C-alpha cells in the first residue's frame, strides 16, 4: 500500500503552526493511523528530517542552496535570479518555491491551461511517500562523474510534480531545514498510542529504540509485528546502543549515599566517548551522538581487532589524545583537531590516542544491559587483552567518602577531568538512553564559585557592537527539559570566545537560523535571531542565580523566577553531544540547591 505525500505535507503544515506538545502528539497519532505499516519507517524518518539514521554512515543529500534554486528554476520555468530575490525577501527557500509555484498555478487556471503543474490549491498531487523517499535516497546515493547533473534532474523532477505545499517541504527537507519542532519522545509516544494501545507502552518503544538507535526500524517492527516483538529486541553488533548518562554531584559523602553505600569509582577522562563494536574482523566505532566515526580512528580499529578476544562484542570506552613524548593526557580540543583533519593517517603519530574501556554491553549473543555492573565488568576483564594504549579505566571500589576524594584528587593530578562513581548493587543495570543516579560524575572547576561546568544548547544569537557590528557576538543558551521535550533559556553568554570562535560563529549558526521561535524553545528573552536547538556548548559561570527573565526551572525555587548563570563564560563547543544530551533543568535545579546549602554552611557561625 502507498500513501499520498500530500498527507505528510498537510501534517507538517499543522505541526508547524502549533507549539503545544499535546497538540503535536494528536497530529502524529492522526498521521500514524493513516499510514500503511509497510512505510511507517519512511514516515518516521521524514518527521526526523533525515533519510536514515546518522550512524549508518550513508551519504547525505549533498545539495546546497544554489543547487536547490537551480533545480527549482528548471521545475518552475523561472529564472534563478527571481527565486534568489524572493528567498532573500522571505529568508526561506521552501516558502519562496511554494509561493512561485502557487502563483503560476493560479495564472494557468485563469487562462484555462491544463499544464503538468496544474494541481488543486489544496495540495493534491500524484506523489507518494515512497516515490519522494526513494527519489531523495537516489539523489543521496548517486556518486561519481556526472552525479551533480543526475541529482539536479531528479530533484527538478520531484519539484515539478509536487503541489506547492509539497514542494515547500521537499525543499526544506533537502536543505535540512524542516524544523517541525517534534522530538523523538513525542514520536515514540504517538507510536505507542497507535500501535501499542496506550501511551503507557512508550517505555517499551523507548527501550527498543535505546537498544537499536533506529526509530524508523523500531516503528516498522511495532507496526508490522506488534508490541511483543519490540519487547524481545536485543542489541545487534553494528547498530549503536544509545548511551547511558550520568547525574552530577560534588560531595563525596552524598555520592556514596546516593549510590547505596558502595561504588566503583573510575577516572573521568577528557576525551571522546566511544562505543566499539566487533564482529569477526569487522569493527565499528560510534560517537556519543551515535555517528559512525570508524574512519576517524584507524588506530583504534587495529587496537580493537587485537584487544577484544570475543568473536562478537559491544564495549564502551573513552578515546583520549596522548602526548607522544611524555605519554600524558592531552585535552579534548586536541582530539577534535585530529578529527577535523581530512587525512587522519597523516596525524596518527602527531596525535596518538589511548582507549580506556569501562563497560561491556553485549558479548557473543548475550545482552548484558540488564546485568548489574559488577557482572558486566567481570566480562569486560575476561574479553579485553590490555596494552599501554588499550586498557580498562583506572578505578577503585570504595564505601569511604575520604577514599573517593583522595582518588578524585589523584585523577585530577593525572590529567583526568574528575571521576565517575557508579552503583554496584543488584539493580545497577545499563540504562541505555537514560540519565539516572546509577552513575554520578564528580568534577570540579577550581577557578569558579560554580562547582561544575554545564552543557547548554544554543537557541538564539545577538549581534555584536563596535568591531563585531553586523556579526554575532553573544548567544542565548538553554537547558533541556526531558519532561516537556523543550529547551528552557538559562543565560546570554558573550564572554570566553576567542577571535577564532567569533569568526566561525556566523557560519556555524547559519544552517540553524529560524525566522521564528522554534517550537521546542521556551524563552521570554528575545534574541536578534532564533536558532534551532542543535549546537551544544560547555559553559562556566560565577554562580547559579535566580532570574525573572529566564524560563529554566521557572517557579521551582521562587514564584516568578527561573534559574540563570551569573557571569557565564564560553569554554568550548561540544560537537560530541546532541541537544538532548545537554544539562537538564533538573540537574541545574539540583546544582542550585547544593550551592545554597554550601553557602549556608560557609556563612554559619562557628564557635561560641
UniProtKB/Swiss-Prot annotation:
Cofactor: Mg(2+); Mn(2+)
Keywords: ATP-binding, Cell cycle, Cell division, DNA damage, DNA recombination, DNA repair, DNA replication, GTP-binding, Ligase, Magnesium, Manganese, Metal-binding, Nucleotide-binding
Statement: the UniProt record of this protein carries the keyword tRNA processing: no
Binding annotation for ATP: 266, 273, 288, 318, 358, 435, 441
GO molecular function: ATP binding; DNA binding; DNA ligase (ATP) activity; GTP binding; metal ion binding
Alphabetical list of Pfam families matching this protein: DNA_ligase_A_C, DNA_ligase_A_M, DNA_ligase_A_N
EC supergroup of this enzyme: ligase
pH effect summary: Optimum pH is 8.0.
Record InterPro entries: ATP-dep_DNA_ligase, DNA_ligae_ATP-dep_bac/arc, DNA_ligase_ATP-dep, DNA_ligase_ATP-dep_C, DNA_ligase_ATP-dep_cent, DNA_ligase_ATP-dep_CS, DNA_ligase_ATP-dep_N, DNA_ligase_N_sf
Catalysed conversion reaction: ATP + (deoxyribonucleotide)n-3'-hydroxyl + 5'-phospho-(deoxyribonucleotide)m = (deoxyribonucleotide)n+m + AMP + diphosphate; ADP + (deoxyribonucleotide)n-3'-hydroxyl + 5'-phospho-(deoxyribonucleotide)m = (deoxyribonucleotide)n+m + AMP + phosphate; GTP + (deoxyribonucleotide)n-3'-hydroxyl + 5'-phospho-(deoxyribonucleotide)m = (deoxyribonucleotide)n+m + GMP + diphosphate
Cell membrane recorded as keyword: no
Residues the record marks as active site: 268
One BP annotation, GO: DNA repair
Thermal dependence summary for this entry: Optimum temperature is 75 degrees Celsius.
EC identifiers of the protein: 6.5.1.7
The family this protein is said to belong to: Belongs to the ATP-dependent DNA ligase family.
Functional note: DNA ligase that seals nicks in double-stranded DNA during DNA replication, DNA recombination and DNA repair. Can use ATP, ADP and GTP, but not CTP, TTP or NAD(+).
HAMAP family: DNA_ligase (MF_00407)
Name assigned to this protein: DNA ligase
Organism: Hyperthermus butylicus (strain DSM 5456 / JCM 9403 / PLM1-5)
UniProt gene name: lig
Amino acid at each position: 500500500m502507498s500513501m499520498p505525500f500530500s498527507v505528510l505535507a498537510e501534517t507538517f503544515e499543522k505541526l508547524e503552526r502549533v507549539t503545544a506538545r499535546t497538540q503535536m502528539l494528536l497530529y502524529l497519532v492522526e498521521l500514524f493511523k493513516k499510514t500503511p505499516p509497510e512505510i511507517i519507517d519512511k514516515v518516521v524518518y521524514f518527521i526526523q528530517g533525515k533519510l536514515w539514521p546518522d550512524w549508518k554512515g550513508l551519504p547525505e543529500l549533498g545539495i546546497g542552496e544554489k543547487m536547490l534554486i537551480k533545480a527549482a528554476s528548471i521545475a518552475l520555468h523561472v529564472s534563478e535570479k527571481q527565486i534568489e530575490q524572493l528567498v532573500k525577501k522571505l529568508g526561506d527557500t521552501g516558502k519562496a518555491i511554494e509561493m512561485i509555484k502557487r502563483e503560476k498555478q493560479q495564472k494557468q487556471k485563469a487562462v484555462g491551461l491544463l499544464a503538468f503543474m496544474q494541481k488543486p490549491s489544496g495540495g493534491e498531487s500524484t506523489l507518494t511517500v515512497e516515490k519522494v523517499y526513494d527519489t531523495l535516497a537516489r539523489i543521496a546515493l548517486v556518486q561519481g562523474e556526472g552525479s551533480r547533473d543526475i541529482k539536479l534532474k531528479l530533484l527538478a523532477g520531484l519539484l515539478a510534480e509536487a503541489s506547492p505545499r509539497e514542494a515547500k517541504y521537499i525543499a526544506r527537507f533537502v536543505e535540512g531545514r524542516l524544523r517541525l519542532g517534534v522530538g523523538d519522545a513525542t514520536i515514540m509516544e504517538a507510536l505507542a498510542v497507535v500501535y501499542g494501545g496506550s501511551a503507557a507502552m512508550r517505555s517499551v518503544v523507548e527501550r527498543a529504540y535505546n537498544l537499536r538507535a533506529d526509530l524508523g526500524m523500531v516503528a516498522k517492527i511495532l507496526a508490522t509485528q506488534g508490541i511483543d516483538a519490540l519487547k524481545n529486541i536485543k542489541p545487534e553488533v553494528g547498530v549503536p546502543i544509545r548511551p547511558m548518562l550520568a547525574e552530577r554531584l560534588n560531595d563525596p559523602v552524598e555520592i556514596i549515599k546516593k549510590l547505596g553505600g558502595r561504588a566503583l569509582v573510575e577516572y573521568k577522562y577528557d576525551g571522546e566517548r566511544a562505543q566499539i563494536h566487533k564482529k569477526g574482523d569487522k569493527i565499528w566505532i560510534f560517537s556519543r551522538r551515535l555517528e559512525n566515526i570508524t574512519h576517524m580512528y584507524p588506530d583504534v580499529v587495529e587496537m580493537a581487532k587485537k584487544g577484544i578476544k570475543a568473536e562478537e562484542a559491544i564495549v564502551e570506552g573513552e578515546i583520549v589524545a596522548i602526548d607522544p613524548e611524555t605519554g600524558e593526557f592531552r585535552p579534548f580540543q586536541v582530539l577534535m583537531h585530529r578529527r577535523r583533519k581530512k587525512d587522519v593517517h597523516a596525524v596518527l603519530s602527531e596525535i596518538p590516542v589511548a582507549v580506556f574501556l569501562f563497560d561491556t554491553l553485549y558479548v557473543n549473543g548475550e545482552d548484558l544491559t540488564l546485568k548489574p555492573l559488577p557482572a558486566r565488568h567481570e566480562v569486560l576483564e575476561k574479553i579485553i587483552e590490555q596494552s599501554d594504549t588499550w586498557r580498562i579505566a583506572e578505578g577503585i571500589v570504595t564505601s569511604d567518602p575520604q577514599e573517593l576524594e583522595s582518588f578524585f584528587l589523584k585523577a585530577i593530578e593525572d590529567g583526568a577531568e574528575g571521576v565517575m562513581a557508579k552503583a554496584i548493587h543488584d539493580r545497577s543495570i545499563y540504562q541505555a538512553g537514560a540519565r539516572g543516579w546509577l552513575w554520578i560524575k564528580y568534577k570540579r572547576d577550581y577557578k569558579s564559585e560554580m562547582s561544575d561546568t554545564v552543557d547548554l544548547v544554543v537557541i538564539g544569537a545577538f549581534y555584536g557592537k563596535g568591531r563585531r557590528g553586523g556579526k554575532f557576538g553573544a548567544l542565548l543558551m538553554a537547558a533541556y527539559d526531558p519532561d516537556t521535550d523543550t529547551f528552557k533559556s538559562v543565560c546570554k553568554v558573550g564572554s570566553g570566545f576567542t577571535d577564532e570562535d567569533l569568526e566561525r560563529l556566523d557560519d556555524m549558526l547559519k544552517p540553524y537560523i529560524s525566522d521564528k521561535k522554534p517550537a521546542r524553545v521556551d524563552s521570554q528573552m528575545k534574541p536578534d535571531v532564533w536558532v534551532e536547538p542543535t549546537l551544544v556548548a560547555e559553559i562556566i559561570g560565577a554562580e547559579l542565580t535566580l532570574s525573572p527573565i529566564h524560563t529554566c526551572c521557572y517557579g521551582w525555587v521562587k514564584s516568578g523566577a527561573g534559574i540563570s548563570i551569573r557571569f557565564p563564560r564560553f569554554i568550548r563547543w561540544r560537537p560530541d553531544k546532541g541537544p538532548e544530551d545537554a544539562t537538564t533543568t533538573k540537574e541545574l535545579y539540583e546544582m542550585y540547591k547544593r550551592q545554597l546549602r554550601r553557602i549556608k554552611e560557609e556563612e554559619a557561625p562557628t564557635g561560641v
